[in-house]
Amino acid sequence: MGFSETFGCISNIHSDDPSTWENKLFITFDIDWAHYDVLSDIIDVVERADVAAIWFVTRDSSLFEHLRANPKFDLWIHPNSNFLLAGETRKGATASEMIDRLIEIVPEAKDVRSHFTTQSSRLLEIFADKGSTHD
């Protein structure tokens, strides 16, 4: 297996097929606090390495079209429930609204990772209802 093939996208994992995950590395990037220039540089480095990567989306960016153009990149939603837990509604008044806002930004996203490992049966149910296949 070559260097490039060592890296995979989590959305391609099938639990019943070890070849989709055994001996693979999975790189993820959280763009939440990344400055545009830093994010652009990181994208360039990953593309030069010709490896797969997952990008966790928490806000809109003009770089998404560039990311979408690379078939080795997956865009996932990355909801931050801390606002809801603190009683703030600026990102959505409910978990469903918060997730809908992110899906508007990345409608093709089928996968999700919550911030700060905030997870619950109800959130998992909402993610699945919205089409998530991996969390």
Report each predicted region and the residues it spans.
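Active-site beta->alpha N-cap acidic-glycine motif
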Residues: 2-74
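Metal-dependent polysaccharide deacetylase catalytic core of the NodB/CE4 family, i.e.
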Residues: 49-125, 133
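Substrate-binding cleft/loops of secretory-pathway carbohydrate-active enzymes
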Residues: 128
